[in-house]
Amino acid sequence: MQKSCNEKEGKPKGSEAKREDEQPCGALEGQRLEGNFRQRLLQSLEEFKEDIDYRHFKGEEMTGEEEEMERCLEEIRSLRKKFRALHSNRTHSRDHPF
């Protein structure tokens, strides 16, 4: 069972009258969480705006990027083929050492 703020500090429950301006134990924590939430929300909003800006490229710019991406993918494919060939040569040489 959870104790009230006053009990945690070692004071009896009814020894002090609560003032209206006092905040309950979880109020500060709630404000911190709300602040963190707002910060994350603002950050995600900024990231979203940046993403939207990138969607408005001209067709020429996108074509250039697509070609570059395709070249990179082709290079990756060729490197994978080379690695497979090297790996298969290495395993075959282990099978028959002489």
Swiss-Prot record:
Record carries keyword Repressor: yes
Residue stretches in coiled coil: 59-89
Compositional bias per record (Basic and acidic residues), positions renumbered to this chain: 1-22
GO annotation, biological process: negative regulation of DNA-templated transcription; negative regulation of NF-kappaB transcription factor activity
Subcellular location: Nucleus
Summary of the function given for this chain in its UniProt record: Plays a role in the negative regulation of NF-kappa-B signaling at the basal level by modulating transcriptional activity of NF-kappa-B on its target gene promoters. Associates with cyclin D1 promoter containing Myc E-box sequence and transcriptionally represses cyclin D1 expression. Regulates telomerase reverse transcriptase expression and telomerase activity in both ALT (alternative lengthening of telomeres)and telomerase-positive cell lines.
Protein name: Transcription elongation factor A protein-like 7
Organism listed in the record: Mus musculus (Mouse)
Gene: Tceal7
